[in-house]
């Protein structure tokens, strides 16, 4: 059963009639007073390794007589580096869709003949934007990669700050990586690690590069949704987020299947130069790639061989092979759907499409979500992928 039911959301959001946005900057709600208005919001949240971005457009802050912006009215909302939280919904019900910091401020005065009005545009990024802006070469205290990821994240003051209610501004949800012994404390906690000289190192890389490297090494995902930062096993939660059919607020839909680049197997290998020993592992695809029998023979003998000099065991080669096989398999199916605005739709989860007909009916893994809101409308656009033909 899916986590959310469209009928329940329709009732909760009062038939999706009156879009509502709440923007909180440094703990203070941006209020529509003195003419200042949030005229539009665009939020793009990604389940990939990229940073998520939000754009907030403010109007009602320009004096036509003096032809200047009333900075006194807006100053408290314009500080770059300020924390920002965006909630979207309808009527009296809203849900958080973005959390990050103000990275850029633009003042825009359009051509006087245009219908557009002068506005201030706030461009915001999630914390990944900060993790990209450094570079280190150092030996960490942690022995295992999940602990090392936690160590790096906890060193970031923006991540570790408290919100206006005294809670954590960012919650770290970190699964243990396979290099950590079973039975060790979860959540990336260091616990009581054995005394050993083995420690994880960062070499000429940013915090972001290091975490992405660790994610690819063990077939993990690294993304942020609202207040939660995830470093977790890829696609482990297969419970659908929501089931959608053509009668559930559909605006636009594009579904496609493409066998280009698919392979039957992935091989990851390396040579231990000291011992002259072969290290490697092989995985085979189990995906159903066609409704007929024409495509399978074309892929059957195709393989991807990847040389990984960092692999020092069959198990590690298997983790990298799983990451590569997962990446290839999920090239098969793609979806771009636009529905009535639903803040519950997030990346990193599966959405089930039903009653569209075969092969459109399928479980798609959401990779990107874009929420678009004006004072009159709210829509949610999502992109997703699938590793098998629709059923």
Label each region the model flagged.
Residues 86, 231-232, 268:
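Short hydrophobic/aromatic-rich beta-strand segments that constitute the beta-sheet cores
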Residues 99, 146-150, 208-212, 265-266, ...:
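Extracytoplasmic/secreted envelope proteins and their assembly/folding machinery
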Residues 49-76, 249-391:
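An acidic/polar, Gly/Ser/Thr-rich interaction patch typically located in mid-to-C-terminal regions
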Residues 89, 234, 271:
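Surface loops and adjacent helix of pleckstrin homology
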């Amino acid at each position: 059963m899916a986590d959310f039911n469209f009928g329940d959301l329709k009732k909760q959001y009062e038939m999706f009639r009156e879009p509502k946005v709440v923007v909180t900057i440094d703990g203070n709600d941006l209020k529509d007073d003195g003419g200042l208005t949030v005229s539009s919001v665009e939020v793009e949240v990604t389940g990939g390794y990229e940073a998520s971005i939000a754009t907030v457009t403010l109007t009602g802050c320009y004096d036509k007589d003096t032809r200047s912006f009333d900075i006194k009215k807006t100053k408290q909302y314009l500080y770059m580096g300020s924390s920002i939280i965006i909630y979207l919904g309808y009527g009296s019900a809203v849900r958080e869709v973005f959390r990050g910091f103000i990275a850029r401020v633009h003042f825009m005065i359009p051509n006087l003949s245009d219908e557009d009005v002068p506005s201030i545009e706030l461009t915001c990024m999630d914390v990944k934007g900060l993790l990209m802006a450094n570079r280190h070469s150092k030996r960490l205290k942690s022995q295992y990669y999940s602990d090392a990821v936690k160590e790096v994240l906890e060193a970031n003051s923006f991540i570790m700050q408290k919100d206006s209610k005294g809670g954590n501004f960012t919650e770290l949800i970190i699964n243990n990586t396979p290099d950590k012994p079973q039975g060790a404390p979860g959540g990336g906690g260091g616990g009581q690690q054995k005394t050993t000289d083995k420690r994880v190192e960062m070499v000429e890389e940013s915090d972001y590069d290091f975490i992405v490297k660790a994610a690819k090494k063990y077939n993990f995902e690294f993304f942020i949704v609202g207040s939660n930062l995830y470093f977790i096993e890829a696609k482990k939660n297969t419970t659908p987020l929501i089931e959608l059919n053509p009668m559930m607020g559909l605006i636009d839909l594009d579904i496609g299947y493409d066998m280009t680049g698919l392979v039957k197997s992935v091989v990851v290998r390396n040579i231990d130069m000291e011992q002259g020993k072969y290290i490697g592992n092989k995985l085979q695809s189990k995906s159903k790639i066609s409704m007929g029998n024409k495509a399978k023979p074309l892929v059957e003998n195709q393989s991807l061989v990847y040389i990984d000099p960092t692999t020092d065991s069959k198990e590690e080669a298997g983790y990298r092979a799983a990451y590569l096989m997962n990446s290839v398999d999920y090239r098969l199916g793609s979806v771009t759907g636009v529905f009535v605005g639903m803040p519950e739709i997030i990346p990193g989860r599966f959405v089930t499409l039903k009653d569209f007909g075969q092969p459109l009916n399928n479980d798609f893994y959401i990779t990107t979500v874009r929420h678009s809101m004006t004072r009159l409308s709210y829509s949610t656009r999502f992109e997703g992928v699938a590793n098998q033909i629709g059923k």
